[in-house]
Every structure is written in structure tokens, then in C-alpha cells.
């Protein structure tokens, strides 16, 4: 039952069961108790499965959203790019027609390419019109503030980084040469380049192991990984205590993506003091500083990827230093509790109600 004195937020985004970054962010909100501070109702607009299943879920979600909208003060719409943008634009329009305050939460690392290369000028005008409907517009980092600020102006934009629950510190073993990857297993995440550098690293460091945690989206890449199965281990999608165990046991984390928003997996690796190798895309430079909290590789470039991984494999002291610095940065800048305080301040700024603090 809703309490009349509390802020009422209707949130829409991928179903919480979906394997992906936005669902992870939403689940972190629930784990941290956001639903106890406000009256929060979450509607999953997308599920994994067949096209028919996805279509039925989208229709069901929209009907549910329309039925609940009159009872809520704020509609918080989580959006990426491409099909996600088209789905969520319908929800945004409905909320404005119902005279509700709208928070648009932009997560899509591929939005610049979608906006600049895939849309006509007419399509870009539509995007600007939809995005301008937000009473508040949340982005993941400074690069996104600049990009979306050029489209809709910066007045209503707030930087709200992704955040996680920081685990209790544990003694970590470095020099074990265990590399962890977590995320979608596809070309855009740099999996092809990662698999390409592994044979050379295996020659230099015979005990090296690469653990791939995710769902395959490319059968050709999966076949390449299976050919290296002696030292490339396919974990499937992992979560909960199993994910935490690998984050603790692996001394190196790698994410060689072509583009990103702000990957939660990098935050999790930081919080677990991993030596990190990733690419300078999206909001990753807000998290990783070269030579301080991690190392960079150039997207699509096997040379720099192999060199950065080799540096950490060769130097456990460097790995320990980078991991320790990353852990401290995660504690001070990416704690879920601080993130929720910022989110509640955004809600309060556009609503007449106040959150309830237990």
C-alpha cells in the first residue's frame, strides 16, 4: 500500500531478470533499499527471448504503465539507444500527456552513433523533442553531459554515475594470473581482440587463465574460445556469490569494449581491487585513470590490449597498486548509498513530496 506522505515513483526499464547493465543498476537500487525510502513501482519493459516474447512484454508493460501512471508523481524512464529509445519514447509521451514529472535516465554508450549516423535530420529532431520532455535528465558522466547538453541544453542534466554496494575488504592474492571478463560476449565488447591476444600471453605466462562470464551472442567467437579451452574458461552468466568469488579470486579484470556508457562490471572490479585493463570509451575515463587506477588499451587494437595485460601479468606489485587505488576510488565516488542520495535530491527538486529516510 502506498503512503500519501511519500514520493511516488513509477520506474520503467528492462526487466530486472535481464542480463545487462541497466537491470544491474536497478537491482542495486532495490538492494540498497530505495523502495523503502519512496513508493517505488518498477515495470519491466523488455525481457530476453524470442521477438514475439519481447513484443508481448512491451505491450503488457505499456498497458501496466498507463494503468498505474495516474497514481504516481514521477515517471523514471531508463533508456539506452536504438530499439530501447523507440520503446521508451512511448512511455515518455504517455507520462507527459498525463501531466506527470518525467526523469529520463540515459544509459546508452552507443547513443552518439545512433543519433549522428543512423537517423535522418527529421529523426534527430524527433529525438531532441522527446529528450526535451524530461523534467530531469540523468547521464552517467561528464562526456555524456557534454554530448546531451549540445542536443537539449545542460540546464536539466545531472551527472549520476552508476554505483554499487562496496563489499567488505578482503586480502587479495596478486600474481595468480587469473583474468576475468564479465559482460556480453560479442564483437562490440572486444572479445575478438581479447581471444586473439591470449595465445601470445599463454606463451609468456604458461599459468595464465581467462575466465569469460557472460552470454554468447556470436557463434564464430564462441568457436574461437572453445579452441582455446585449455586456458579460456567459459563460465556462462554468473551472479551473486559466484560472481563475487571470481571477482575476489581473479587479480586482473579486462573489458576491451568499442563503446560503453558506464559499465557496472568495471565498478565491481574496482571495488574488489582488481588490476584493470579497459578502453577509454564513454564514462570509463571518469573511473579509470591511466597508471593510477588501471591501464588503457585502444579499442579494436590487439597490440595495446596485449601490452597492457602483459604489464599486469609481469608485475604483481603494479597490479596491487592499481587495484588498491581503484578500490579507494570506488569507495569515495561510486558507493550506492551516495548515489541514492543524489537521485532522491533530483526527485525532490521536481516533486512537492519528500523521501522517507529510515
Annotate each PLM feature:
Residues 10, 171-189, 194-200, 211-213:
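Conserved donor-binding/catalytic core segment of Leloir-type glycosyltransferases
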Residues 44-47, 182, 195, 209-222, ...:
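Glycosyltransferase donor-sugar binding loop
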Residues 126-168:
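Donor nucleotide-sugar binding/catalytic pocket of nucleotide-sugar-dependent glycosyltransferases
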Residues 222-238:
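Nucleotide-activated donor-binding/catalytic signature segment of Leloir-type glycosyltransferases, i.e.
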Residues 237-238, 245-250:
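Short alpha-helical donor nucleotide-sugar binding micro-motif in glycosyltransferases
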Residues 275-278:
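Short hydrophobic beta-strand element within catalytic cores of glycosyltransferases
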Residues 290-291, 295-302, 311-316:
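Conserved acidic donor-binding segment of nucleotide-sugar-dependent glycosyltransferases
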Amino acid at each position: 500500500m502506498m503512503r500519501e506522505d511519500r514520493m511516488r515513483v513509477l520506474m520503467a526499464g528492462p526487466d530486472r531478470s535481464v542480463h545487462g547493465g541497466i537491470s544491474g543498476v536497478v537491482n542495486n537500487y532495490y538492494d540498497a533499499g530505495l523502495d523503502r525510502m519512496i513508493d517505488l513501482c518498477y515495470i519491466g519493459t523488455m525481457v530476453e527471448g524470442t521477438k514475439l516474447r519481447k513484443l508481448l512484454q512491451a505491450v503488457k508493460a505499456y498497458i501496466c504503465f498507463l494503468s498505474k501512471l495516474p497514481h504516481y508523481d514521477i515517471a523514471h524512464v531508463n533508456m539506452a539507444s536504438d530499439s530501447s529509445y523507440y520503446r521508451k519514447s512511448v512511455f515518455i509521451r504517455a507520462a507527459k500527456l498525463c501531466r506527470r514529472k518525467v526523469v529520463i535516465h540515459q544509459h546508452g554508450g552507443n547513443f552518439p552513433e545512433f543519433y549522428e549516423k543512423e537517423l535522418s535530420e527529421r529523426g534527430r529532431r524527433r529525438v531532441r523533442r522527446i529528450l526535451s520532455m524530461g523534467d530531469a535528465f540523468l547521464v552517467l558522466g561528464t562526456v555524456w553531459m557534454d554530448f546531451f547538453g549540445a542536443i537539449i541544453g545542460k540546464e536539466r542534466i545531472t551527472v549520476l554515475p552508476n554505483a554499487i554496494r562496496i563489499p567488505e575488504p578482503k586480502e587479495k592474492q596478486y600474481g595468480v594470473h587469473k583474468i576475468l571478463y564479465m559482460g556480453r560476449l560479442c564483437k562490440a565488447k572486444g572479445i575478438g581482440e581479447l581471444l586473439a591476444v591470449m595465445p601470445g600471453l599463454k606463451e609468456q605466462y604458461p599459468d595464465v587463465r581467462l575466465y569469460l562470464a557472460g552470454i554468447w551472442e556470436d557463434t564464430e567467437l564462441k568457436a574461437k574460445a572453445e579452441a582455446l579451452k585449455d586456458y579460456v574458461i567459459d563460465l556462462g552468466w554468473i551472479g551473486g556469490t559466484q560472481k563475487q568469488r571470481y571477482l575476489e579470486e581473479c587479480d586482473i579484470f579486462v573489458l576491451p569494449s568499442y563503446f560503453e556508457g558506464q559499465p557496472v562490471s568495471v565498478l565491481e572490479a574496482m571495488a574488489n581491487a582488481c588490476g584493470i585493463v579497459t578502453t577509454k570509451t564513454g564514462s570509463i575515463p571518469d573511473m579509470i585513470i591511466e597508471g593510477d587506477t588501471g591501464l588503457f588499451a585502444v579499442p579494436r587494437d590487439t597490440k595495446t590490449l596485449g601490452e597492457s595485460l602483459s604489464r599486469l601479468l609481469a608485475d604483481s606489485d603494479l597490479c596491487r597498486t592499481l587495484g588498491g587505488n581503484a578500490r579507494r576510488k570506488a569507495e569515495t565516488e561510486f558507493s550506492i548509498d551516495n548515489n541514492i542520495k543524489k537521485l532522491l535530491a533530483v526527485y525532490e527538486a521536481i516533486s512537492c513530496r519528500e523521501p522517507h529516510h529510515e
